[in-house]
Structure formats: structure tokens, C-alpha cells
């Protein structure tokens, strides 16, 4: 990993693979996940001629872990610091889970000047269910808005049980280094609440670059309908649902995910 310093002095980390002159593809992992979780995507993207960057923003992976001050706005600013420090142009931003909504935070603050396309991996832009958005986190609505994630991410009873996922589980455990530390610090709980209560639909509607929304058909967290509904919010949106796939769509079914991502990147 290579380090760089954010504008407030916090250390961020990233790795580079592939052709330094290739089109930049920036991979952003989700909540509690590290840059290493993209291990199944890096070789495929690098082999296709891209400059591949996997990033650990503050509080994740090998980056510095401040006890406080990490929210979605700060994550968007961290991403800006990375893109600016490396002077990336026409970058494809790919975000899994919270990494996806981090992209909307970045775009809402800094615009599209450095970005040519966006791919969101199994992340609804609005986790709170409402009359106009039934594609949020299962059983999460105004009635439990401030309590549902008070102790972490609750089980939903949806998706394929881990014991029945076979090789999908093996890939998941490999990419996530055995599952990682599931305990949450007060700072992480604050970030999770900020993530859960945000609504990024206006940011999507303001986007003019191509956006691909990918859903796992068997996601543990939300119905796969979020992908098509999100794509409908932006003029250059498209969506895909991967069969027999969970929330970690790029990890559980990497061949199908990589095939679709590479085909889409080649078109946009």
C-alpha cells in the first residue's frame, strides 16, 4: 500500500495495479471492508489495460483510524483528496455497499470533472423505506429510524443462509480475511447511522455521466429492485441483477460481475 495525507492530516492508503497509462478505475470498499476485498476484480481490470486503484479511506483497512469525525461527507472529501493527489482524469469510480454512496457524497461536493463513469455495487441510495422508496433496508422505516442500527447491522432473515452458499462463502471469507472484526466502535456506529439515514437520490438525479447499478438477487439487506429504480433516476443509468448472488456481489459471483463490469466500462 502507498500512503497519502488527507487535507486534515489523516493518512489514507491505496494500491495501484495495471497500466499506469490506462483508464483509471478506482475501487471503493464498503463499511468495515478493506481495499483487499477487491482481490477478484483487480486482475481482470488490470488485464483489460486499466490503471486499477484500490483505496482505503479513513477508518478502514490500512488507513488511519481516527476515533471521531468520520461521516459520509468526510468520506466524500477523502475520495476527493485521493483523486486530486493522484491527478486522476476520466476515472471510473466503482463502489461496493457504503463505498457506492461515498461516490454520491463526493459528486455532490465536487462534481464530475474527474469522473467519466460510476458503478454502484448492491447499494440502495436510500436505506430508509418510505412511500416513495420501498427499496431500502429490510424492516427499516421512520418508526425505527434512530434505533435500527444502534448496535450494528441487524440480521434481516433475507438472502441465502451462509451455510448454503458453498464456494460463494469461501470467496467471501477469503476476500474479507475470514470475516474481520464485527465489533463496532462508537465512531463506527456514528458513521453507520449517518449512512443509514442519508438520501442520495438527488445526487443521482444530478449526475450526467453513465451509471451502472448492480444488485445481488439474493442480497441480505434490500430487494434487488433498488438497482432498476436507481437507474431510472438518471438519464444515463442502467442496471443489472446477478443471479444467486448476495450483497457482496463482486465477491460471491466474481466471474459474472467482472464480465458485466468490463463490458459496460468498454462501452462508456
Q: What is the predicted function of each stretch?
A:
Residues 187-232, 241:
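Conserved serine/cysteine hydrolase catalytic core
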Residues 236-268:
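Catalytic active-site module of serine/aspartate enzymes centered on a nucleophile-bearing elbow/loop
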Residues 1-25, 47-50, 88-89, 116, ...:
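Alpha/beta-hydrolase fold catalytic core
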Residues 10-65:
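Conserved HGGG/HGGXW glycine-rich cap/lid loop of the alpha/beta-hydrolase fold
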